Protein backbone atom coordinates (compact mmCIF):
# COMPACT_ATOMS: atom_id res chain seq x y z
CA UNK A 1 0.00 0.00 0.00
CA UNK A 2 1.40 3.36 -1.00
CA UNK A 3 1.97 5.87 1.74
CA UNK A 4 0.58 9.27 0.79
CA UNK A 5 1.58 12.49 2.47
CA UNK A 6 -1.11 13.56 4.91
CA UNK A 7 -2.13 17.18 5.34
CA UNK A 8 -1.08 18.81 8.59
CA UNK A 9 -4.09 20.34 10.40
CA UNK A 10 -1.79 22.36 12.68
CA UNK A 11 0.06 24.10 9.85
CA UNK A 12 -0.38 27.86 9.67
CA UNK A 13 -0.39 29.46 6.21
CA UNK A 14 1.66 32.52 7.01
CA UNK A 15 1.43 33.92 3.45
CA UNK A 16 -2.34 34.25 3.78
CA UNK A 17 -2.01 35.72 7.28
CA UNK A 18 0.44 38.39 6.17
CA UNK A 19 -1.62 39.11 3.03
CA UNK A 20 -4.64 39.79 5.23
CA UNK A 21 -2.58 42.02 7.52
CA UNK A 22 -1.27 44.01 4.54
CA UNK A 23 -4.82 44.47 3.20
CA UNK A 24 -5.99 45.76 6.59
CA UNK A 25 -3.04 48.16 6.73
CA UNK A 26 -3.80 49.44 3.23
CA UNK A 27 -7.44 50.08 4.12
CA UNK A 28 -6.38 51.89 7.29
CA UNK A 29 -4.04 54.14 5.30
CA UNK A 30 -6.80 54.95 2.78
CA UNK A 31 -9.22 55.86 5.59
CA UNK A 32 -6.77 58.20 7.31
CA UNK A 33 -5.73 59.96 4.07
CA UNK A 34 -8.23 62.81 3.37
CA UNK A 35 -7.29 65.03 0.38
CA UNK A 36 -7.76 68.80 0.45
CA UNK A 37 -7.96 71.36 3.22
CA UNK A 38 -10.61 71.82 5.86
CA UNK A 39 -12.79 74.05 3.65
CA UNK A 40 -13.08 71.49 0.88
CA UNK A 41 -13.89 68.81 3.45
CA UNK A 42 -16.68 71.00 4.89
CA UNK A 43 -18.10 71.46 1.35
CA UNK A 44 -18.07 67.71 0.82
CA UNK A 45 -19.95 67.22 4.08
CA UNK A 46 -22.53 69.88 3.10
CA UNK A 47 -23.06 68.19 -0.29
CA UNK A 48 -23.63 64.85 1.44
CA UNK A 49 -26.23 66.45 3.70
CA UNK A 50 -28.00 68.13 0.74
CA UNK A 51 -28.11 64.84 -1.14
CA UNK A 52 -29.50 63.13 1.93
CA UNK A 53 -32.26 65.72 2.39
CA UNK A 54 -33.20 65.78 -1.31
CA UNK A 55 -33.35 61.99 -1.45
CA UNK A 56 -35.64 61.92 1.59
CA UNK A 57 -38.02 64.62 0.12
CA UNK A 58 -38.30 63.28 -3.43
CA UNK A 59 -39.96 59.98 -4.29
CA UNK A 60 -37.70 57.58 -6.20
CA UNK A 61 -38.74 56.25 -9.59
CA UNK A 62 -36.74 53.03 -9.23
CA UNK A 63 -38.99 50.45 -7.57
CA UNK A 64 -36.48 47.56 -7.77
CA UNK A 65 -34.47 48.82 -4.82
CA UNK A 66 -35.69 47.39 -1.54
CA UNK A 67 -36.07 49.13 1.78
CA UNK A 68 -33.15 47.23 3.31
CA UNK A 69 -30.72 48.43 0.62
CA UNK A 70 -31.80 52.05 1.05
CA UNK A 71 -31.45 51.91 4.84
CA UNK A 72 -28.00 50.32 4.55
CA UNK A 73 -26.78 53.04 2.15
CA UNK A 74 -28.09 55.86 4.32
CA UNK A 75 -26.59 54.35 7.48
CA UNK A 76 -23.18 54.07 5.79
CA UNK A 77 -23.35 57.69 4.61
CA UNK A 78 -24.44 58.94 8.05
CA UNK A 79 -21.63 57.01 9.69
CA UNK A 80 -19.06 58.45 7.28
CA UNK A 81 -20.30 62.01 7.85
CA UNK A 82 -20.17 61.66 11.64
CA UNK A 83 -16.66 60.19 11.47
CA UNK A 84 -15.36 63.01 9.26
CA UNK A 85 -16.95 65.64 11.56
CA UNK A 86 -15.26 64.14 14.59
CA UNK A 87 -11.87 64.15 12.87
CA UNK A 88 -12.35 67.81 11.82
CA UNK A 89 -13.24 68.79 15.39
CA UNK A 90 -10.13 67.11 16.73
CA UNK A 91 -8.01 68.79 14.05
CA UNK A 92 -9.40 72.29 14.89
CA UNK A 93 -9.10 71.85 18.66
CA UNK A 94 -6.43 74.20 20.10
CA UNK A 95 -3.40 72.67 21.80
CA UNK A 96 -2.19 74.23 25.04
CA UNK A 97 1.51 73.29 24.94
CA UNK A 98 3.94 72.17 22.23
CA UNK A 99 5.36 69.29 24.29
CA UNK A 100 1.95 67.70 24.73
CA UNK A 101 1.34 68.01 20.99
CA UNK A 102 4.62 66.33 20.11
CA UNK A 103 4.05 63.50 22.58
CA UNK A 104 0.53 62.94 21.25
CA UNK A 105 1.75 62.83 17.65
CA UNK A 106 4.41 60.25 18.51
CA UNK A 107 1.91 57.96 20.26
CA UNK A 108 -0.63 58.32 17.47
CA UNK A 109 1.99 57.48 14.86
CA UNK A 110 3.08 54.39 16.78
CA UNK A 111 -0.50 53.22 17.22
CA UNK A 112 -1.70 54.02 13.72
CA UNK A 113 1.34 52.94 11.70
CA UNK A 114 0.11 49.88 9.76
CA UNK A 115 3.62 48.72 8.93
CA UNK A 116 4.44 48.26 12.59
CA UNK A 117 1.18 46.37 13.11
CA UNK A 118 2.26 43.79 10.52
CA UNK A 119 4.82 42.41 13.01
CA UNK A 120 2.55 42.68 16.05
CA UNK A 121 1.47 39.57 17.93
CA UNK A 122 -2.33 39.17 17.61
CA UNK A 123 -2.51 37.49 21.04
CA UNK A 124 -0.43 39.67 23.37
CA UNK A 125 0.10 42.77 21.12
CA UNK A 126 3.90 42.46 21.32
CA UNK A 127 5.82 44.29 18.57
CA UNK A 128 8.31 41.99 16.84
CA UNK A 129 11.12 43.21 14.65
CA UNK A 130 10.55 40.89 11.69
CA UNK A 131 8.18 38.27 10.38
CA UNK A 132 10.45 35.43 11.49
CA UNK A 133 10.43 36.72 15.06
CA UNK A 134 6.64 37.08 14.91
CA UNK A 135 6.23 33.47 13.74
CA UNK A 136 8.52 32.18 16.47
CA UNK A 137 6.72 34.28 19.07
CA UNK A 138 3.27 33.06 18.00
CA UNK A 139 4.38 29.44 18.36
CA UNK A 140 5.42 30.22 21.91
CA UNK A 141 1.71 30.69 22.61
CA UNK A 142 0.69 27.55 20.73
CA UNK A 143 3.35 25.31 22.28
CA UNK A 144 1.09 24.50 25.23
CA UNK A 145 -1.74 23.48 22.91
CA UNK A 146 0.36 21.01 20.95
CA UNK A 147 0.12 17.45 22.21
CA UNK A 148 3.03 15.75 23.93
CA UNK A 149 3.74 13.40 21.04
CA UNK A 150 3.99 16.03 18.30
CA UNK A 151 6.95 18.34 17.89
CA UNK A 152 5.97 21.51 16.02
CA UNK A 153 8.43 23.45 13.88
CA UNK A 154 8.22 27.14 14.86
CA UNK A 155 9.03 28.31 11.31
CA UNK A 156 6.84 26.30 8.94
CA UNK A 157 4.43 24.65 11.36
CA UNK A 158 5.33 21.08 10.42
CA UNK A 159 4.64 18.47 13.11
CA UNK A 160 7.45 15.95 13.59
CA UNK A 161 7.39 12.71 15.54
CA UNK A 162 10.57 13.00 17.63
CA UNK A 163 12.87 15.64 19.13
CA UNK A 164 15.77 14.52 16.94
CA UNK A 165 13.68 14.95 13.79
CA UNK A 166 12.71 18.45 14.89
CA UNK A 167 16.35 19.32 15.56
CA UNK A 168 17.44 18.16 12.11
CA UNK A 169 14.46 19.93 10.55
CA UNK A 170 15.29 23.24 12.26
CA UNK A 171 18.73 23.24 10.62
CA UNK A 172 17.03 23.43 7.22
CA UNK A 173 15.42 26.82 7.84
CA UNK A 174 18.63 28.58 8.89
CA UNK A 175 20.51 30.37 6.13
CA UNK A 176 23.92 28.93 7.02
CA UNK A 177 22.50 25.52 8.04
CA UNK A 178 23.41 26.22 11.68
CA UNK A 179 21.62 26.46 14.96
CA UNK A 180 22.45 27.55 18.50
CA UNK A 181 22.64 25.79 21.83
CA UNK A 182 19.72 26.92 23.99
CA UNK A 183 21.88 27.05 27.15
CA UNK A 184 25.37 28.30 26.28
CA UNK A 185 24.65 29.74 22.80
CA UNK A 186 27.35 27.79 20.95
CA UNK A 187 26.75 27.11 17.26
CA UNK A 188 26.63 23.66 15.70
CA UNK A 189 26.12 22.55 12.11
CA UNK A 190 25.25 18.85 12.35
CA UNK A 191 22.78 16.78 14.33
CA UNK A 192 25.70 14.65 15.52
CA UNK A 193 26.92 17.50 17.74
CA UNK A 194 23.75 18.27 19.69
CA UNK A 195 21.04 16.59 21.72
CA UNK A 196 17.32 17.33 21.52
CA UNK A 197 16.03 17.50 25.07
CA UNK A 198 12.27 17.46 25.77
CA UNK A 199 11.77 19.16 29.11
CA UNK A 200 8.64 18.92 31.29
CA UNK A 201 8.73 22.68 31.76
CA UNK A 202 10.60 25.59 30.21
CA UNK A 203 13.88 26.24 31.95
CA UNK A 204 14.20 29.39 34.02
CA UNK A 205 16.84 31.44 32.25
CA UNK A 206 17.78 33.24 35.48
CA UNK A 207 19.17 29.99 36.86
CA UNK A 208 21.33 29.31 33.80
CA UNK A 209 25.01 29.82 34.70
CA UNK A 210 27.02 32.09 32.47
CA UNK A 211 29.44 29.43 31.29
CA UNK A 212 30.55 29.03 27.71
CA UNK A 213 31.23 25.61 26.30
CA UNK A 214 34.83 24.68 25.66
CA UNK A 215 35.10 23.27 22.17
CA UNK A 216 35.54 24.13 18.51
CA UNK A 217 32.08 25.70 18.34
CA UNK A 218 32.55 28.07 21.29
CA UNK A 219 34.38 30.66 19.19
CA UNK A 220 31.41 31.05 16.89
CA UNK A 221 28.97 31.75 19.73
CA UNK A 222 30.04 35.38 20.17
CA UNK A 223 27.87 36.72 17.36
CA UNK A 224 24.61 35.34 18.73
CA UNK A 225 21.75 37.70 19.53
CA UNK A 226 20.87 38.19 23.17
CA UNK A 227 17.18 37.46 22.61
CA UNK A 228 15.74 34.62 24.71
CA UNK A 229 15.51 31.28 22.89
CA UNK A 230 12.24 29.87 21.62
CA UNK A 231 11.04 26.55 23.05
CA UNK A 232 8.72 24.91 20.48
CA UNK A 233 6.68 22.28 22.33
CA UNK A 234 9.25 22.18 25.14
CA UNK A 235 12.21 21.24 22.92
CA UNK A 236 15.74 22.37 23.73
CA UNK A 237 18.66 21.96 21.35
CA UNK A 238 21.71 21.39 23.55
CA UNK A 239 25.24 20.83 22.24
CA UNK A 240 27.05 17.73 23.44
CA UNK A 241 30.00 19.56 25.02
CA UNK A 242 27.83 22.07 26.87
CA UNK A 243 29.32 22.48 30.34
CA UNK A 244 26.59 24.95 31.27
CA UNK A 245 23.86 22.37 30.61
CA UNK A 246 25.62 19.74 32.72
CA UNK A 247 26.05 22.24 35.54
CA UNK A 248 22.40 23.22 35.22
CA UNK A 249 21.30 19.59 35.55
CA UNK A 250 23.47 19.19 38.63
CA UNK A 251 21.87 22.22 40.25
CA UNK A 252 18.33 21.13 39.34
CA UNK A 253 18.58 17.50 40.58
CA UNK A 254 20.86 17.55 43.63
CA UNK A 255 19.32 14.49 45.30
CA UNK A 256 19.88 12.24 42.29
CA UNK A 257 23.44 13.45 41.86
CA UNK A 258 24.26 12.91 45.53
CA UNK A 259 22.77 9.41 45.36
CA UNK A 260 24.89 8.52 42.31
CA UNK A 261 28.07 9.89 43.91
CA UNK A 262 27.38 7.97 47.12
CA UNK A 263 26.94 4.73 45.18
CA UNK A 264 30.13 5.42 43.23
CA UNK A 265 32.31 6.14 46.27
CA UNK A 266 30.95 3.55 48.73
CA UNK A 267 33.44 1.02 50.20
CA UNK A 268 33.45 -2.63 49.20
CA UNK A 269 32.11 -3.92 52.54
CA UNK A 270 29.22 -1.46 52.52
CA UNK A 271 28.42 -2.42 48.93
CA UNK A 272 28.36 -6.15 49.77
CA UNK A 273 26.07 -5.52 52.74
CA UNK A 274 23.72 -3.43 50.58
CA UNK A 275 23.58 -6.11 47.88
CA UNK A 276 22.84 -8.78 50.50
CA UNK A 277 19.97 -6.70 51.90
CA UNK A 278 18.56 -6.19 48.41
CA UNK A 279 18.75 -9.92 47.65
CA UNK A 280 16.98 -10.79 50.91
CA UNK A 281 14.22 -8.27 50.25
CA UNK A 282 13.77 -9.55 46.71
CA UNK A 283 13.58 -13.17 47.90
CA UNK A 284 10.96 -12.31 50.53
CA UNK A 285 8.89 -10.45 47.93
CA UNK A 286 9.02 -13.38 45.52
CA UNK A 287 8.02 -15.85 48.24
CA UNK A 288 4.87 -13.87 49.01
CA UNK A 289 3.75 -13.10 45.44
CA UNK A 290 0.71 -14.67 43.80
CA UNK A 291 0.91 -16.82 40.64
CA UNK A 292 -0.46 -13.96 38.55
CA UNK A 293 2.13 -11.55 39.91
CA UNK A 294 4.87 -14.13 39.31
CA UNK A 295 3.84 -14.56 35.69
CA UNK A 296 3.75 -10.80 35.12
CA UNK A 297 7.18 -10.42 36.74
CA UNK A 298 8.70 -13.16 34.62
CA UNK A 299 7.32 -11.67 31.42
CA UNK A 300 8.61 -8.26 32.44
CA UNK A 301 12.05 -9.68 33.24
CA UNK A 302 12.21 -11.54 29.93
CA UNK A 303 11.30 -8.40 28.01
CA UNK A 304 13.87 -6.33 29.87
CA UNK A 305 16.54 -8.96 29.27
CA UNK A 306 15.67 -9.10 25.57
CA UNK A 307 15.93 -5.32 25.22
CA UNK A 308 19.21 -5.33 27.10
CA UNK A 309 20.65 -8.01 24.82
CA UNK A 310 19.62 -6.04 21.73
CA UNK A 311 21.60 -3.02 22.94
CA UNK A 312 24.73 -4.81 24.16
CA UNK A 313 28.05 -4.64 22.33
CA UNK A 314 30.07 -7.59 21.03
CA UNK A 315 32.39 -7.48 24.01
CA UNK A 316 29.50 -7.48 26.48
CA UNK A 317 27.87 -10.35 24.61
CA UNK A 318 31.07 -12.42 24.75
CA UNK A 319 31.40 -11.85 28.50
CA UNK A 320 27.74 -12.78 29.05
CA UNK A 321 28.06 -16.01 27.08
CA UNK A 322 31.19 -16.93 29.03
CA UNK A 323 29.36 -16.37 32.32
CA UNK A 324 26.42 -18.45 31.11
CA UNK A 325 28.71 -21.34 30.14
CA UNK A 326 30.43 -21.31 33.52
CA UNK A 327 27.11 -21.21 35.37
CA UNK A 328 25.73 -24.06 33.24
CA UNK A 329 28.82 -26.19 33.88
CA UNK A 330 28.53 -25.73 37.64
CA UNK A 331 24.80 -26.41 37.58
CA UNK A 332 25.18 -29.66 35.64
CA UNK A 333 27.95 -30.84 37.92
CA UNK A 334 25.72 -30.53 40.98
CA UNK A 335 22.39 -31.78 39.54
CA UNK A 336 20.67 -34.95 40.72
CA UNK A 337 19.67 -37.82 38.38
CA UNK A 338 16.02 -36.71 38.46
CA UNK A 339 16.91 -33.15 37.48
CA UNK A 340 19.20 -34.45 34.77
CA UNK A 341 16.42 -36.62 33.35
CA UNK A 342 14.01 -33.66 33.30
CA UNK A 343 16.68 -31.52 31.61
CA UNK A 344 17.22 -34.10 28.89
CA UNK A 345 13.47 -34.21 28.23
CA UNK A 346 13.38 -30.42 27.92
CA UNK A 347 16.33 -30.44 25.55
CA UNK A 348 14.68 -33.08 23.40
CA UNK A 349 11.49 -30.99 23.16
CA UNK A 350 13.57 -27.96 22.26
CA UNK A 351 15.26 -29.89 19.45
CA UNK A 352 11.88 -30.97 18.10
CA UNK A 353 10.75 -27.34 18.12
CA UNK A 354 13.90 -26.29 16.32
CA UNK A 355 13.46 -28.93 13.61
CA UNK A 356 9.85 -27.85 13.13
CA UNK A 357 10.90 -24.22 12.84
CA UNK A 358 13.45 -25.13 10.19
CA UNK A 359 10.67 -26.50 8.02
CA UNK A 360 8.69 -23.27 8.26
CA UNK A 361 9.05 -20.20 6.12
CA UNK A 362 12.12 -18.02 6.68
CA UNK A 363 10.08 -14.95 7.58
CA UNK A 364 8.00 -16.85 10.12
CA UNK A 365 11.10 -18.43 11.61
CA UNK A 366 12.69 -15.02 12.07
CA UNK A 367 9.48 -13.77 13.66
CA UNK A 368 9.33 -16.71 16.07
CA UNK A 369 13.00 -16.27 16.91
CA UNK A 370 12.51 -12.63 17.91
CA UNK A 371 9.18 -13.03 19.73
CA UNK A 372 9.38 -14.98 23.01
CA UNK A 373 5.59 -15.07 23.39
CA UNK A 374 5.22 -16.75 19.99
CA UNK A 375 7.87 -19.28 20.96
CA UNK A 376 6.03 -20.00 24.21
CA UNK A 377 2.76 -20.44 22.33
CA UNK A 378 4.41 -22.86 19.94
CA UNK A 379 5.89 -24.79 22.86
CA UNK A 380 2.45 -25.00 24.49
CA UNK A 381 1.05 -26.28 21.21
CA UNK A 382 3.76 -28.93 21.01
CA UNK A 383 2.81 -30.23 24.46
CA UNK A 384 -0.53 -31.43 23.03
CA UNK A 385 1.24 -33.79 20.62
CA UNK A 386 1.66 -37.37 21.78
CA UNK A 387 5.19 -38.64 22.17
CA UNK A 388 6.15 -41.51 19.83
CA UNK A 389 6.74 -43.85 22.80
CA UNK A 390 5.11 -44.24 26.18
CA UNK A 391 6.43 -42.72 29.38
CA UNK A 392 7.88 -46.00 30.72
CA UNK A 393 9.74 -46.72 27.49
CA UNK A 394 11.02 -43.13 27.38
CA UNK A 395 12.35 -43.40 30.94
CA UNK A 396 14.11 -46.70 30.18
CA UNK A 397 15.67 -45.22 27.02
CA UNK A 398 16.87 -42.14 28.87
CA UNK A 399 18.33 -44.23 31.72
CA UNK A 400 20.12 -46.47 29.23
CA UNK A 401 21.48 -43.41 27.44
CA UNK A 402 22.71 -41.96 30.72
CA UNK A 403 24.45 -45.24 31.63
CA UNK A 404 26.07 -45.38 28.18
CA UNK A 405 27.35 -41.79 28.53
CA UNK A 406 28.77 -42.55 32.00
CA UNK A 407 30.60 -45.60 30.63
CA UNK A 408 32.09 -43.52 27.82
CA UNK A 409 33.23 -40.84 30.26
CA UNK A 410 34.85 -43.43 32.55
CA UNK A 411 36.64 -45.07 29.61
CA UNK A 412 38.00 -41.71 28.48
CA UNK A 413 39.40 -40.96 31.95
From Swiss-Prot:
<feature type="region of interest" description="Disordered">
    <location>
        <begin position="26"/>
        <end position="83"/>
    </location>
</feature>
<comment type="function">
    <text>May be involved in transcriptional regulation.</text>
</comment>
<dbReference type="GO" id="GO:0005634">
    <property type="term" value="C:nucleus"/>
</dbReference>
<keyword id="KW-0677">Repeat</keyword>
<dbReference type="InterPro" id="IPR013087">
    <property type="entry name" value="Znf_C2H2_type"/>
</dbReference>
<keyword id="KW-0175">Coiled coil</keyword>
<feature type="region of interest" description="Disordered">
    <location>
        <begin position="279"/>
        <end position="320"/>
    </location>
</feature>
<dbReference type="InterPro" id="IPR036236">
    <property type="entry name" value="Znf_C2H2_sf"/>
</dbReference>
<keyword id="KW-0238">DNA-binding</keyword>
<comment type="similarity">
    <text>Belongs to the krueppel C2H2-type zinc-finger protein family.</text>
</comment>
<dbReference type="GO" id="GO:1990837">
    <property type="term" value="F:sequence-specific double-stranded DNA binding"/>
</dbReference>
<feature type="compositionally biased region" description="Acidic residues">
    <location>
        <begin position="58"/>
        <end position="67"/>
    </location>
</feature>
<keyword id="KW-0804">Transcription</keyword>
<feature type="coiled-coil region">
    <location>
        <begin position="260"/>
        <end position="367"/>
    </location>
</feature>
<keyword id="KW-0539">Nucleus</keyword>
<keyword id="KW-0863">Zinc-finger</keyword>
<feature type="zinc finger region" description="C2H2-type 1">
    <location>
        <begin position="117"/>
        <end position="141"/>
    </location>
</feature>
<keyword id="KW-0862">Zinc</keyword>
<keyword id="KW-0805">Transcription regulation</keyword>
<protein>
    <recommendedName>
        <fullName>Zinc finger protein 821</fullName>
    </recommendedName>
</protein>
<feature type="zinc finger region" description="C2H2-type 2">
    <location>
        <begin position="151"/>
        <end position="173"/>
    </location>
</feature>
<dbReference type="GO" id="GO:0008270">
    <property type="term" value="F:zinc ion binding"/>
</dbReference>
<keyword id="KW-0479">Metal-binding</keyword>
Amino acid sequence: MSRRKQTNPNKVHWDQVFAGLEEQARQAMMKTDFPGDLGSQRQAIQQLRDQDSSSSDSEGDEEETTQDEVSSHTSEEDGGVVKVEKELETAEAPVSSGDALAEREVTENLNSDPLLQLCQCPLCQLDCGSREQLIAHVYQHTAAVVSAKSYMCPVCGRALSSPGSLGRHLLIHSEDQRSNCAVCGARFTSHATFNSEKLPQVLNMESVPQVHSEGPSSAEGKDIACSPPVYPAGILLVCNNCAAYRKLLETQTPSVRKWALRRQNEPLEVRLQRLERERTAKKSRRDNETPEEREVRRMRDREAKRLQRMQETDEQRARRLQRDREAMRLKRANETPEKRQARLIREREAKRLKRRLEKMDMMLRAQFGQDPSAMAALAAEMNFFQLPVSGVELDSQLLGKMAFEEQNNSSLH
